[in-house]
Amino acid sequence: MKVDYEQLCKLYDDTCRTKNVQFSYGTAGFRTLAKNLDTVMFSTGILAVLRSLKLQGQYVGVMITASHNPYQDNGVKIVEPDGSMLLATWEPYAMQLANAASFATNFEEFRVELAKLIEHEKIDLNTTVVPHIVVGRDSRESSPYLLRCLTSSMASVFHAQVLDLGCVTTPQLHYITDLSNRRKLEGDTAPVATEQDYYSFFIGAFNELFATYQLEKRLSVPKLFIDTANGIGGPQLKKLLASEDWDVPAEQVEVINDRSDVPELLNFECGADYVKTNQRLPKGLSPSSFDSLYCSFDGDADRVVFYYVDSGSKFHLLDGDKISTLFAKFLSKQLELAHLEHSLKIGVVQTAYANGSSTAYIKNTLHCPVSCTKTGVKHLHHEAATQYDIGIYFEANGHGTIIFSEKFHRTIKSELSKSKLNGDTLALRTLKCFSELINQTVGDAISDMLAVLATLAILKMSPMDWDEEYTDLPNKLVKCIVPDRSIFQTTDQERKLLNPVGLQDKIDLVVAKYPMGRSFVRASGTEDAVRVYAECKDSSKLGQFCDEVVEHVKASA
């Protein structure tokens, strides 16, 4: 490969208009006002190519999205060949390259930093390997321009093959990146993966699960309402619903807040984050009947929350904790029926923000192991993948998935090959189908929704039945502005404070006063503030409980 640095210099000068801005790459990648992202897109495009070269030309994904953020924002993140998030050791490179492009006074200064990265990772630019990139974007108005900034150097300078998926959900980008590489590794002669592969696979798994139970009705409720946050989830979901293999009567499903063509409506008074935060129905939805089920996606359809309205018109949220416990209940039972409860390990992974009632229910009622990790999907995903054969994780905000180990797949295949037509076989087939219904690469609103619908139908549970498995403890999350958030240092997966010294002891004394009380403090990742979480048995005392903790935090800050 011959790198055309003269062309790269021209593209740098033409593209990198945003200068002297510090950029940070977090769990969500880069994310800020869209008007400030041209420079970041340019550098991220180069980094994605280098990542593919490092991995001998495997497909690397790049998604342009800002998820549940306001429509003025946008962002970008890189996806590994297996559909997982960018390797943690490469996150500093993303920042290094972006900030080099931002603060360099000329192209040569940027080129020096680029050369350092290439040398450090021992990437051979004289190779015959062709880098492969999969790109996708959400429905934001700024996305087409930012895509041009992203891909400007990929083919013209680095001779990369770029597969542009157009407008897709974030989980579709993850899935298609993974599938493209699996086909490449297996020597599959089929063309590169497409979104049609996505729809065919997940609808197929959904239908097979119902066929296994000989269930004709696909929904356990008379009607399902889906709020797609006026984001890319709307048109992509409608493609699924229009598929000839989708076997749910049209009158049973209604998609609302599906105006992805009106940029300023994105996430406005709708979507998963709005519903969870405000504990209310989204804009455009009024209670139709108390036996309907509702769900909301976020802007790029990688998270989902459910809810219903009871006969007294009271709103009930079924969040990520409720989703993980539903799946744990269902899959634990299937393992027992298949007599595999001692062979395969199932567990639920949570963060400190999980409601204490959900943790108690999983441990004491389901008798299922629970792990707690630091906040952030990469921590949850790693724990689920490394500690369990069936690792279930959902953040309370509705982002999550289930990871099935290689041992799980080997065991199920082996047991199915020798089992007879009995209860064992039904459970084994259920486990196999369910593992295919889940998008294991990342949280996926569409896939997770299908899995919830299938579980409720098989268990013959109504939304109220699901909700009544356990009752959430009253809880509150408040933001407390502090002069310097860096002094708040935690341990025990962010549940205890090390510093400021003595503050944790004061919090413990407050917690002890409230039955079933729990509280923790952690620094914000983006601003000089800390988040104070509190929960207790008595909702009338919750405000007082939280205020006491906040007072101690302010005094220590």
From Swiss-Prot:
Catalytically driven reaction(s): N-acetyl-alpha-D-glucosamine 1-phosphate = N-acetyl-D-glucosamine 6-phosphate
InterPro entries per record: A-D-PHexomutase_a/b/a-I, A-D-PHexomutase_a/b/a-I/II/III, A-D-PHexomutase_C, A-D-PHexomutase_C_sf, A-D-PHexomutase_CS, AMG1_II, AMG1_III, PAGM
Subcellular location per the Swiss-Prot or TrEMBL entry: Cytoplasm; Nucleus
Record keyword Transferase present: no
Phenotype of the disrupted gene, per the record: Results in undivided strings of cells and growth arrest after approximately 5 division cycles.
Keyword Cell division on entry: no
Domain of life where this protein originates: Eukaryota
Needed co-factor(s): Mg(2+)
UniProt keyword annotations, A-Z: Carbohydrate metabolism, Cell wall biogenesis/degradation, Cytoplasm, Isomerase, Magnesium, Metal-binding, Nucleus, Phosphoprotein
Record-stated family: Belongs to the phosphohexose mutase family.
Function: Catalyzes the conversion of GlcNAc-6-P into GlcNAc-1-P during the synthesis of uridine diphosphate/UDP-GlcNAc, which is a biosynthetic precursor of chitin and also supplies the amino sugars for N-linked oligosaccharides of glycoproteins. Also has phosphoglucomutase activity.
Name assigned to this protein: Phosphoacetylglucosamine mutase
Classification lineage: Eukaryota, Fungi, Dikarya, Ascomycota, Saccharomycotina
